[in-house]
């Protein structure tokens, strides 16, 4: 296995070209592939011990067996239940329709996942896909991520962080008749329209500039909720990669080897999906 990985790393350009070719074949089979993209990160505990001290109060370690790994936090696990881990994170953009990976990146666990949302979106576009919506959880809720998606003509579908004492100058307007309702969006003007529920107020409607708190697809709408359900696609894909394709537990060390291991697992996923699509077309 070691010799095989060494030879494969030397042929990295050819291996990357193989991944691109498989993705192109899948895009030809599934025209809607990549239209709605779900982005998230998942932990990959290292094949090493990240404790600073050895057991029973021994001396401090001079170096770790996997120096590229680092301590990170599992966002889906409470800290009281052992949310910290030593290793890596795989950041992935997955098609919400086909559950297939479109772009991915392996990094040390200490890096926040929000740093890789826009690079992943750029990688998806570089592979020939045209994402219209980008679905992420509240860990990605930031002005930079929202504005970056809009600049790429991709509607951000991001759950909002409920921060304490947050200023709300552009919140949805309200009146004595209740909270105003969404009445449409102008994508050219980057604004949303809100209307008085009774129609008695003057003016009866107002336009609000779209921003992180008031996106062009408002969180109050049915469409936003339906799109956000697509975020489960990336969670399902992480589960399949770990349980069925051997992404975890790791048996290699070093960022380069771990990234190659992830590439091989994802290549197997894409190749199997392509084989199934071809089998269906031949049977028909």
Report the location of each language-model feature.
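Generic structural signal of hydrophobic/aromatic residues within well-ordered alpha-helices
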Residues: 4, 15-18, 22, 26, ...
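Positions that flank functional sites
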Residues: 164
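Cys/His-rich short segments
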Residues: 167-215
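Alpha-helix-centered segments that form part of catalytic cores
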Residues: 69-88, 195, 200-228
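Polybasic low-complexity intrinsically disordered regions
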Residues: 1-151, 157-161, 263
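Charged alpha-helix within mobile-element recombinases
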Residues: 20-25, 188, 192, 228-230, ...
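A glycine-rich, aromatic-flanked flexible loop/lid motif
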Residues: 93, 208-209, 237-241
């Amino acid at each position: 296995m070691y010799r095989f990985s060494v030879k494969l790393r030397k042929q990295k350009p050819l291996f990357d070209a193989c991944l691109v070719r498989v993705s192109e074949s899948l895009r030809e089979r599934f025209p809607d592939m990549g239209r709605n993209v779900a982005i998230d990160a998942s932990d990959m505990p290292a094949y090493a011990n990240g404790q600073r001290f050895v057991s029973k109060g021994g001396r401090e370690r001079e170096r770790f067996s996997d120096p590229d790994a680092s301590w990170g936090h599992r966002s889906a696990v409470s800290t009281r239940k052992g949310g910290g881990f030593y290793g890596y994170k795989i950041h992935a953009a997955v098609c919400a329709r086909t559950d297939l990976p479109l772009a991915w990146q392996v990094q040390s666990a200490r890096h926040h996942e929000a740093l890789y949302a826009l690079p992943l979106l750029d990688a998806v576009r570089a592979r020939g896909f045209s994402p219209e919506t980008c679905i992420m959880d509240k860990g990605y809720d930031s002005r930079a991520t929202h504005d970056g998606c809009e600049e790429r003509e991709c509607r951000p579908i991001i759950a909002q962080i409920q921060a304490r004492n947050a200023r709300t100058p552009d919140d949805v307007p309200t009146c004595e008749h209740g909270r105003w309702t969404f009445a449409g969006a102008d994508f050219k003007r980057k604004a949303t329209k809100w209307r008085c529920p009774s129609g008695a107020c003057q003016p009866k409607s107002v336009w609000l500039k779209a921003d992180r708190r008031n996106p062009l697809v408002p969180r109050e709408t049915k469409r936003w909720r339906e799109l956000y359900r697509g975020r489960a696609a990336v969670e399902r894909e992480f589960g399949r990669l770990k349980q069925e394709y051997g992404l975890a537990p790791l048996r290699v060390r070093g960022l380069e080897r771990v990234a190659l291991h992830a590439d091989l697992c994802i290549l197997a996923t894409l190749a199997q999906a392509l084989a199934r699509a071809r089998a269906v077309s031949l049977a028909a």
